[in-house]
From Swiss-Prot:
Region of interest: G1: 19-26
Family: Belongs to the TRAFAC class translation factor GTPase superfamily. Classic translation factor GTPase family. EF-Tu/EF-1A subfamily.
Gene: tuf1
Record region (G5): 169-171
Subunit architecture: Monomer.
Pfam families recorded: GTP_EFTU, GTP_EFTU_D2, GTP_EFTU_D3
Key word RNA-binding present: no
Keywords: Cytoplasm, Elongation factor, GTP-binding, Hydrolase, Magnesium, Metal-binding, Nucleotide-binding, Protein biosynthesis
Protein's recorded name: Elongation factor Tu
Origin organism lineage: Bacteria, Pseudomonadati, Pseudomonadota, Alphaproteobacteria, Hyphomicrobiales
Domain tr-type G, chain residue ranges per copy: 10-201
GO terms for MF: GTP binding; GTPase activity; guanosine tetraphosphate binding; translation elongation factor activity
Compartments where found: Cytoplasm
Length: 391
């Protein structure tokens, strides 16, 4: 059969498998590819290549497949630490997750931890695959496990009562030992993923935002700010705000340039220079953002989930405590901040992931799910994500 051309006609969605070690995440990933993609065996997925994201090495396996309605990119990580790092750094963006729970064991510590992480990093939706159902003869026991999973999801503010839970067996699907628990269950799972996990809004449809990387003064024309448009569209003549570091100011974009050509607009993904009216070279700086008025506010205090690098990863050699003062690298710039650890957490060791409060010394254009690096003198020692804004 000739290899079919990749059609961009279907909406694209990024998902991943999460859950406790040995509950069957990788087997399920293999089973999905068997019916919806180019089959990848367990060993091919398990031998995940290492990648670097924000200075952190993470092993992740990527597979792709498609249903009648969508094209999926699916990420599976071999180790628990890889999951933690992946979710916090956003190395593989997740528009939704498939939580794999072994029916024979029920929810376990990493089940809980992955659900909490999904909540902290803002994974929009979860679908559950209750795996290894061929190992459980007792229907009441299955119901009990399902109830436990629903309660756990609700505890972490996911809609536990409405989340689809599909019962099946990834191994049965791979070995064709039971059509009902195997192929049928996998097809039901993907139907649930198709209908329950929302299609993400494309970056171009979101409100305009461009992190400012550089500022130039062009004699006779004014001030130009350059950067890569993160989302949305900016048209010549539109009003925008400059947010972060200093008081928010309004200005008008009087020109957009790309590769030395004048355009009438810049859009998500473009590297542009924007000419702005009535703003002096000294009034704007790297680290601020240009955005649609009112869409983003500057903040200094937030709650974050962070992963702290190990010594082997090039991180710190020693723990840190409350009042630790590193730099937080947001988009294009470092800002010093003070860390407050949660009650009961005395210190954070290299290799830990931690929920913490941060107070920056100057405000930054910020919203939930914004990611950052934690640095000491230009060296990355951690990665984090804004889980909620305090003020």
């Amino acid at each position: 059969m000739a290899k079919s051309k990749f059609e961009r006609t279907k909406p694209h969605v990024n998902i991943g498998t999460i859950g406790h070690v040995d509950h069957g995440k990788t087997s399920l990933t293999a089973a999905i590819t068997k019916f919806f993609g180019e089959f990848k065996a367990y060993d091919q997925i398990d031998a995940a290549p290492e990648e670097r994201a924000r200075g952190i090495t993470i092993s992740t396996a990527h597979v792709e497949y498609e249903t009648a309605n969508r094209h999926y990119a699916h990420v599976d990580c071999p180790g628990h630490a890889d999951y933690v790092k992946n979710m916090i750094t956003g190395a593989a963006q997740m528009d939704g997750a498939i939580l794999v729970v072994s029916a024979a064991d029920g929810p376990m510590p990493q089940t809980r931890e992955h659900i909490l992480l999904a909540r902290q990093v803002g994974v929009p939706a979860i679908v559950v695959f209750l795996n290894k159902c061929d190992q459980v003869d007792d229907a009441e026991l299955l119901e009990l496990v399902e109830l436990e999973v629903r309660e756990l999801l609700s505890k972490y503010e996911f809609p536990g009562d409405e989340i689809p839970i599909i019962k099946g067996s990834a191994i049965a699907a791979l070995e064709d030992s039971s059509k009902e628990l195997g192929e049928d269950a996998i097809r039901n799972l993907m139907d649930a993923v198709d209908s329950y996990i929302p299609t993400p809004e494309r970056p171009i449809d979101q409100p305009f935002l461009m992190p400012i990387e550089d500022v130039f003064s062009i004699s006779g024309r004014g001030t130009v700010v350059t950067g890569r448009v993160e989302r949305g569209i900016v048209k010549v003549g539109e009003e925008v705000e400059i947010v972060g570091i200093k008081a928010t100011t309004k200005t008008t974009v009087t020109g957009v340039e790309m590769f030395r050509k004048l355009l009438d607009q810049g859009q998500a993904g473009d590297n542009i220079g924007a000419l702005i009216r009535g703003v002096g070279r000294e009034d704007v700086e790297r680290g601020q953002v240009l955005c649609k008025p009112g869409s983003v506010k500057p903040h200094t205090k937030f709650k974050a989930e962070a992963y702290i690098l190990t010594k082997d990863e090039g991180g710190r050699h020693t723990p840190f405590f409350t009042n630790y003062r590193p730099q937080f690298y947001f988009r294009t710039t470092d800002v010093t901040g003070v860390v407050t650890l949660p009650a009961g957490t005395e210190m954070v060791m290299p290799g830990d992931n931690v929920a913490m409060d941060v107070t920056l010394i100057v405000p930054i254009a910020m919203e939930e799910k914004l990611r950052f690096a934690i640095r000491e003198g230009g060296r990355t020692v951690g990665a984090g994500i804004v889980s909620s804004i305090i003020e």
